[in-house]
Amino acid sequence: MDIRQEALKKHYEWKGKLEIAPRTHVTNSEELSLAYTPGVAEPCLAIRDDYEKSYLLTRRANMVAVITDGSAILGLGDIGPEAGMPVMEGKCVLFKEFAGVDAFPLCVRTKDVDELVRTIYLISGSFGGNNLEDIAATRCFEVERKLKEICDIPVFHDDQHGTAVVVAAALLNALKVVGKTMETAKVVINGAGSAGVAIGKHLMNLGVKDLIMVDRFGIICEGMEGLNPAHEEMSRKTNPRHITGTLADAMRGADVFIGVSAPGVVTREMVASMNEGACVFPMANPVPEIHPDEALAAGAAVVGSGRSDYKNQINNVLAFPGIFRGALDCRAKDINEAMKVAASYAIANLVADDELSADYIIPKAFDKRVGPAVAEAVAKAARETGVARI
C-alpha cells in the first residue's frame, strides 16, 4: 500500500477529520429555553460576576486551540495556513483519542509575530490552553515568549517541548541500559531549530553538563558570527570544552547523538567514532540522519528514531495529550519546566527495570498507561510549583 496515496484518498472521503457534536440536545421548547434563551442568560451573568466560572459553565475547561501560521508544516516548509489544516485537524484527533481533550484547529493568515500573538491572545478566553504548532524558527520562540507573558492559560509549542519531553524520557532509559548518567554523558544535538534548542534546554534541566549543538554551519560556540538570539543563548550555555569544527568532530568521543536535522548527514564512521555504549537517536522524518540498522551495525548500543517501523519510536503523542490533560485538570496558568521534567520521568518510569532493554526504552505510542501517568505527574508538578488554580 502506498500510504501517501491512501491518505489522500481517505481525506477526500472524510472531508475533514473533525465535526462539532453537542453535549446536550434541543428537541422541544423546554430544552430550547434551557440551552439558549431565556435560560442561558443565567450562566452568562454568573461568568460576568466571576470569570473563573467560565471553566465550570462552558466547555472551556476541556478546550485547547491548536494554532499554526502554516510556516513550518511537517517537513514541507512554508505552505500556508490552509495547507496546514489537515495536520492541525490530525493533531486535534490525537488530543481527543489519547487524552479526551477537545481541541480546535486555528490556521492564521499572518507571519507577523505581534499580529499572531495578538490574535491568539484575543481568542484565549474561549480555551483552557493554546498549543502552538508548526510555526517556523526563530519566530516560534518569540511568539511563545510573548504569549506566555500575557496569557493566563498554558501556551505550549509542541514542536519544541513535546519533542524535548519524549527525547528526554527515551534518553533517561537508554542511559540506564548502557550504565551512564545525564550528568556524565557527552551529548551532541544536530539541528538547532525549534526542536533542537528545546531538547538542549530540557536535557540541561535534567542534569546534562556536556552538550554540543551543531547546525549546518558546524558546532555552535560562543563568539561565532551570525548567530540568531536563540543560538546566541545556547552558545553561552553549551559546549563547555569549546570544541569547534563539523558534526564529525562533535560526535568523536560522544556518548549520545540526537538528530533533528536532515536525512543522511551521519555516516557509519561517525557513529563508530563515538564512545562505547553510544546512544543514537536519528529523528529526521521520514528519512533519518542515519538508518537505525546502519547505526547499530556501526556500533551503537541503543537506537531510537521517529519511525514507527523500528523499535524505540520517539513520538510526541506520548507527551502532549497527557501534558495538556494534566494542565487542564488542575486549571494551570502555565506549563512550566517542572511540569515538563515530570512528564519525561512519568513516561520513562512506565518501562519497568525488568523490561528495560536496548530494544525497549520507551512505551509504545498506544500504551494506554501513558496519558493518565503523564497527566497525573504534570498536575502534581503544577500544584507544587504554584501554577495550578485548583
PLM segments and residue spans:
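Glycine-rich phosphate/diphosphate-binding loop of Rossmann-like nucleotide-binding domains
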Residues: L74, I79-A99, H157, H161, ...
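General beta-strand structural signal in soluble alpha/beta enzymes
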Residues: P105, N131-D134, V155-D158, I189, ...
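Rossmann-like adenosine-cofactor binding region
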Residues: E232-A301, R307-D309
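Solvent-exposed alpha-helices and their adjacent loops that cap or buttress functional pockets
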Residues: Y12, Y55-R60, K96-E97, L122-S124, ...
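Adenosine-phosphate binding glycine-rich loop
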Residues: D158-D159, V178-T181, P282-I390
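Short, ordered loop/turn segments at secondary-structure junctions
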Residues: D69-S71, I79, V108-R109, D134-C140, ...
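N-terminal ligand-binding/catalytic initiation module
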Residues: M1-V155, A375, A381, T385-R389
